[in-house]
């Protein structure tokens, strides 16, 4: 396998730009070849069109819109002196291949900082909002770290905002940061909070990330020549306070207190006791959503909806009641307004229909573009264990042998459910 020298900038390093610099590149057509290689020709054409539409807007609305990415949704890396590009670690596959994810480990990682939201995930929504006349501020943050600290940083930034009112659009874990920040001084001007697939009561994906059975962890391990999924889980992902703070609360997981390490399997990767204690405190103190919250919930995707411990292994119940990552029961809190869309978790901020609904919600406080009632559940329930999930994606990927299109597909589908989900569901249908 031919790889660049460790210090040689990759194509992902070279294209690590600020949002404004990226917009200018899409408008001008410069770096078209490299951008098309990373985004694909169709995505490049879409982003160029959206950037030109946003450029034509002459007058911005008075309200500021803060966009918060979800977990793993902010690029992380280290800055380098110009003209050398910044060293992008998350998510640069060349670094993953060489075992570089070890640099994410806490608390001993040094020199890493947020380097903007993942462009593929959040540029389309940002540009559509700009084209609608909104001033969009992307609030990047280190998604590994304590969410309470991230909330305080957001509240401080909101307190310095000059706009007369603020709207927050938060995807996934970013919504927990927003909820916490909205109870702190500095957030008084927040008029509305649009929650895109926010795991208000946690996600079982956090359990699987710690156990090394989460799709993202396993697919990254397939690229990593030095670590398997269990090693990545133990040495890297289980060191993040944020992942522990995403564990399901008792309202979502009544059969298991997942903040109690004694209720986890004794074998395999484990949570960290100190982080479990901090996570319990965070979730216990998280303020309830108020009337400013509007939830947009993805539905009808294969999602882990419950868990049980059996024979020293976790067994997960899977149904279509969720967005593939966040169970529907976790995405729709309290009495806030709720809307539903058949969409995968990672596609919520990319969806055209969701973006149009968000713009209507910002303007009018309601929308007709999404369903106000959830559709009927399909009634398909299967179970899968950690043991079964560990049989997936064990073969290493030769990244250099893949085409640019295969590179894009692999990175854009890191959270794709494992084959067991579809196979077991198909067998269940056959039995009926």
Task: Name every feature range the model reports, one short phrase each.
Residues 1-233, 237, 316, 322-328, ...:
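N-terminal non-catalytic accessory region
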Residues 137, 145, 233, 240-315:
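Alpha/beta-hydrolase fold catalytic core
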């Amino acid at each position: 396998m031919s790889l660049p020298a460790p210090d040689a900038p990759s194509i992902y390093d070279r294209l690590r730009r600020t949002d404004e610099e990226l917009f200018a590149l899409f408008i001008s057509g410069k770096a078209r070849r490299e951008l098309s290689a990373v985004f694909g020709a169709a995505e490049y054409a879409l982003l160029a069109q959206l950037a030109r539409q946003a450029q034509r807007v002459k007058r911005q609305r008075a309200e500021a819109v803060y966009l918060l990415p979800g977990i793993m949704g902010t690029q992380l890396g280290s800055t380098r002196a110009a003209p050398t590009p910044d060293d992008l670690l998350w998510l640069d596959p060349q670094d993953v291949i060489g075992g570089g994810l070890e640099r994410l480990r806490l608390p001993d990682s040094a020199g890493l900082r947020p380097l903007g939201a993942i462009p593929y995930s959040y540029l389309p929504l940002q540009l559509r909002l700009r084209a609608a006349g909104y001033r969009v501020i992307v609030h990047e943050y280190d998604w590994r770290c304590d969410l309470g600290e991230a909330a305080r940083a957001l509240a401080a930034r909101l307190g310095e905002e000059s706009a007369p009112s603020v709207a927050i659009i938060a995807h996934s874990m970013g919504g927990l940061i927003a909820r916490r920040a909205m109870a702190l001084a500095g957030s008084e001007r927040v008029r509305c909070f649009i929650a895109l697939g926010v795991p208000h009561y946690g996600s079982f994906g956090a359990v699987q990330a710690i156990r090394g059975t989460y799709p993202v962890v396993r697919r990254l391990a397939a690229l990593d020549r030095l670590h398997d999924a269990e090693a990545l889980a133990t040495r890297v992902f289980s060191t993040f306070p944020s992942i522990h703070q995403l564990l399901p609360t008792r309202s979502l997981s009544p059969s298991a207190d997942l903040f109690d390490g004694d209720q986890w399997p004794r074998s395999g990767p484990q949570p960290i006791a100190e982080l479990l204690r901090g996570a319990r405190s965070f979730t216990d103190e998280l303020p309830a959503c108020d009337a400013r919250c509007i939830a947009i919930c993805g539905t009808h995707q294969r999602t882990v909806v419950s868990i049980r411990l059996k024979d020293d292994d976790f067994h997960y119940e899977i149904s279509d009641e969720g967005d593939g990552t966040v169970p529907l029961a976790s995405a729709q809190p309290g009495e806030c307004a709720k809307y539903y869309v058949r969409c995968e978790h990672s596609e919520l901020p990319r969806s055209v229909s969701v973006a149009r609904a968000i713009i209507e919600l910002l303007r009018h406080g309601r929308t007709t573009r999404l369903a106000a009632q959830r559709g009927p559940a399909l009634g398909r329930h299967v179970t899968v264990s950690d043991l079964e999930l560990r049989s997936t994606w064990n073969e290493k990927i030769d990244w250099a042998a893949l085409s640019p299109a295969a590179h894009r597909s692999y990175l854009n589908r890191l959270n794709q459910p494992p084959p067991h989900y579809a196979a077991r569901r198909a067998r269940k249908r056959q039995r009926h």
